Swiss-Prot record:
The protein's name: Phosphatidylglycerol--prolipoprotein diacylglyceryl transferase
Binding-site residues, a 1,2-diacyl-sn-glycero-3-phospho-(1'-sn-glycerol): 140
Keywords attached to this entry: Cell inner membrane, Cell membrane, Membrane, Transferase, Transmembrane, Transmembrane helix
One function term, GO molecular function aspect: phosphatidylglycerol-prolipoprotein diacylglyceryl transferase activity
Pathway it works in: Protein modification; lipoprotein biosynthesis (diacylglyceryl transfer)
Lineage: Bacteria, Pseudomonadati, Pseudomonadota, Gammaproteobacteria, Enterobacterales
Species annotation: Buchnera aphidicola subsp. Acyrthosiphon pisum (strain Tuc7)
Length: 281
């Protein structure tokens, strides 16, 4: 009735004490794709960035988004833990990144480049935006291989997936819904939405093509960035209804997730940018 999580090894290879993981590899290929696609796009739009500037910009944004993603996760999702375990802030191999924090980090970097090179920040973000969805999709594949960020329990969904490492969270579900005990006994874990794959499709594939086809024509400055903010925010809010809330936070007011709260300003900002770019004279 349900789909069992495939036996995927999150480690590609190990040399001595060092292990190369698929999740980290997804960051690498995302950066390489951004470098390749960014240079390809620059051929059509040399007035914005030349090749050397593109490399510098992408290196800086990659670093800024990684730092911002880490700080964002600490502040938005687990501040109480990290405030008492300061050294754990640097244990990035244990996971803990926030897209919204990474976005803030990238905006800070783009603001600096905007000031340095005397270009509008929306010109820079319009150039960067088409490079983002591939990385989002690759990251979700990394999450899937790690068997993390799975969805909520869904016993009535035939294509729900059995994630073997969800058992600790499953036991909490059993306390609230004792009738699920039979499923836990039968399958060893409760069936859940494979939300990593949902996000891979919506944020990675679908969003990539939306931005790709929209940006093929000349658009008003800021409209590409605005469109990305709107659709990412909508997709993220939608998926959060199926995704298991972070256990240390849960549902805020038993209604909304942190991811949904952080995505709402993205939609509002995207609408404002689109309006000012396309309709305001």
């Amino acid at each position: 009735m349900y789909i069992f999580f495939p036996k995927l090894n999150p480690i590609i290879f190990t040399i001595g004490p060092v292990s190369a993981r698929w999740y980290g590899f997804m960051y690498v290929i995302s950066f390489l794709f951004a470098m390749w696609y960014g240079k390809k796009c620059s051929i059509k739009n040399k007035k914005i960035w030349y090749e050397k500037k593109i490399e510098t910009l992408l290196y800086a944004i990659f670093l800024g988004s990684c730092i911002g993603g880490r700080i964002g996760y600490i502040i938005f999702y687990n501040f109480s833990y990290y405030s008492q375990n300061m050294l754990s802030v640097f244990y990035i191999w244990e996971g803990g990144m926030s897209f919204h924090g990474g976005l803030i980090g990238a905006i800070i970097v783009m603001s600096y480049f905007s000031f340095k090179y005397k270009k509008k920040i929306l010109e820079i973000s319009d150039f960067i935006t088409p490079l983002i969805p591939f990385g989002l999709g690759a990251g979700r594949i990394g999450n899937f291989i790690n068997s993390e960020l799975w969805g909520r329990v869904s016993p009535n969904f035939s294509y729900a997936m059995i994630f073997p490492n969800s058992q600790n969270q499953d036991l909490k579900e059993i306390k609230k819904y004792p009738e699920l005990q039979l499923l836990l006994d039968q399958y060893g874990a409760l069936p859940r939405h494979p939300t990593q794959l949902y996000e891979f499709f919506l944020e990675g594939i679908l969003l990539f093509f939306i931005i790709y086809f929209f940006s093929k024509k000349d658009r008003p400055t800021g409209s590409i960035s605005g469109l990305f903010l709107i659709f990412y925010g909508l997709f993220r809010i939608f998926i959060e209804f199926f995704r298991e809330p972070d256990p240390q936070i849960g549902l805020l007011k038993n209604i909304i997730t942190m991811g949904q709260i952080l995505s709402l300003p993205m939609i509002i900002a995207g609408l404002i940018i689109m309006y000012k770019s396309c309709y305001k004279k």
